[in-house]
């Protein structure tokens, strides 16, 4: 984690022109949980924060709901202003209240998110979007990938451990998925994975981090959710999948419909203490395999242990 300097400096915009760059002004995230994302600066004022009403929403617990504001000056330069955030806005290692930005300048919000002012044309914007998607999303299901989850989990785990708030991790695995692949083929198996992903996504909150963890295993990170409510969430997902029909095409090209079940394991920071993030993941994985050994199509957590 980046150490936050204590001193604060202030610099007021002095009318320096934005320069001769063409294209749209954008903020590119070059460090932090949203790394790789690009946000177009198309309004006179743009709020950066983790609140739902922020213009640039960065879902990082170390960032305030309304953390900083970018303003366009009369000569089309950009000024970033801190909005009395808890963890501060930094420029070149110093905490700032207000600073003028030039093309290529970087500033930091919170403990680890670094943003860079740049100018992009439409082709560059699309390239940046595709680059971010390919780096963070699973190509088959459209869910976040394992690397993205681990990056987010590292930040969330540290925050929850410091502030004594709940964080739950649900691990799901499709029961007997190999039999689906063996009987119907891998194309059918992929169709099942994609449909199941959509079901889980629709049954989850906007702020929940859902990822394909590997193969037929999925993980959901639930911020500020205790063990009891995480177990209720996992049971709701399990029942919804058990009651659903999954459409697929068999090896001969004929349409088919099947049912399936999942098993789930839950670990919660707050209900138990974990020395490391790896211990936290291992606990959820342990409960997942307890559910498997107990007969599958069930959820296991620390409740009742």
List the model feature ranges, each with a label.
Residues 35-111:
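Forkhead-associated
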Residues 131-151, 172-185, 194:
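Conserved nucleotide-binding and Mg2+-coordinating catalytic segments in signaling enzymes
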Residues 141, 170-173, 215, 284:
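Conserved metal-coordinating catalytic motifs of nucleotidyl cyclase and c-di-GMP turnover enzymes
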Residues 209-212:
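A short pre-motif secondary-structure segment
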Residues 231, 255, 267-305:
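Catalytic-core segments of nucleotide cyclases and related cyclic-nucleotide turnover enzymes
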């Amino acid at each position: 984690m980046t150490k936050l300097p204590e001193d604060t400096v202030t610099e007021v915009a002095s009318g320096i022109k934005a320069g001769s760059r063409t294209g749209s002004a954008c903020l590119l995230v070059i460090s932090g949980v949203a790394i790789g994302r690009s946000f177009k600066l198309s309004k006179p004022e743009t709020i950066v924060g983790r609140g739902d009403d922020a213009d640039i929403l960065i879902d990082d617990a170390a960032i305030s709901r309304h953390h900083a504001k970018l303003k366009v000056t009369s000569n089309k330069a950009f000024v970033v202003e801190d909005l009395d955030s808890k963890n501060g806005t930094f420029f070149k290692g110093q905490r700032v209240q207000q600073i003028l930005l030039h093309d290529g300048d970087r500033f930091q919000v919170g403990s680890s998110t670094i943003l860079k002012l740049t100018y992009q044309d439409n082709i560059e914007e699309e390239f940046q979007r595709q680059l971010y998607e390919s780096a963070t999303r699973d190509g088959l299901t459209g869910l976040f990938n394992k690397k993205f989850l681990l990056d987010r989990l590292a930040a969330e785990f540290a925050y929850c451990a410091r502030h004594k708030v709940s964080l739950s991790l649900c691990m799901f695995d499709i029961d007997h998925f190999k039999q689906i692949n063996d009987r119907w083929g891998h194309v059918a198996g992929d169709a099942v994975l994609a449909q199941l992903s959509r079901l889980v996504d629709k049954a989850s909150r906007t702020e929940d981090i859902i990822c394909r963890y590997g193969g037929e295993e999925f993980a959901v990170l639930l911020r500020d959710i205790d063990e009891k409510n995480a177990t209720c969430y996992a049971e709701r997902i399990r029942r919804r999948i058990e009651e659903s029909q999954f459409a697929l095409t068999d090896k001969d090209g004929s349409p088919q419909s099947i049912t399936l079940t999942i098993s789930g394991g839950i670990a919660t920071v707050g209900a138990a203490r974990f020395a490391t993030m790896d211990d936290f993941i291992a606990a959820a994985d342990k409960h997942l395999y307890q559910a498997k050994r107990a007969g599958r199509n069930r959820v296991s957590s620390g409740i009742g242990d």
